[in-house]
Amino acid sequence: MKNETLLPVGVRRDGSYYTRVLWADVTENDPTFWVNNLINDDLERNGGTWGANSETTANCVLDFFGETQKVKKISVYKNVGITISILEELAKYITVYSSVTDEPLKLRRKEDRIDDVEWTEVCRFDIVMEEGWQSIVLPEAVDAKYIRVELKENFCRHDESFIPWIETSEIKLYPEG
């Protein structure tokens, strides 16, 4: 039986928007930890995580293939890199920003600075340290042509056992309704 359900342009069968990675200030050579893992629907360890070897923050910019969309819900799947990874490597905070201008297109090189672009803060997740989905439904939908995802800190203690990785697995953005 063929599924004849028609979806709005740019919306996936799970109801989330199609997105692509425009830019990231931290990514790794190992595909296990690539920033593109944020949008690949792989929720497993050993291949489905954005792992940033950073002690402070990691940023990436997603877009909607040049379109402006209304975003009402943001979901994050929390998982860490490989079998030996510990949940303390999860990002402790995730802040989401939006832009409706083409200013983020200035971000082209590793040396570019995310704060050279004007962003509007949309929400901040205080992450619960466990594997699985965590969502925020916004009070009002926001217009966005670009979405900035900022991972901040991790749950590790700041002593000799500190592990300098900030990780999460998947980001999904949803329209109203």
Predicted regions: what is each one?
Residues M1, N40-E111, E130-G177:
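Aromatic, loop-rich ligand-recognition surfaces of beta-strand-rich domains
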Residues K2-N40:
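Predominantly extracellular/luminal regions of secreted and cell-surface proteins
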Residues D14, V122, V128, P139-V142:
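A general, composition-driven signal for non-globular sequence regions
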Residues P31, W119, M129-S135:
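Short, surface-exposed linear segments at secondary-structure transitions and domain or protein termini
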Residues R108-R124:
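Local beta-strand/beta-hairpin segments that build beta-sheet-rich folds
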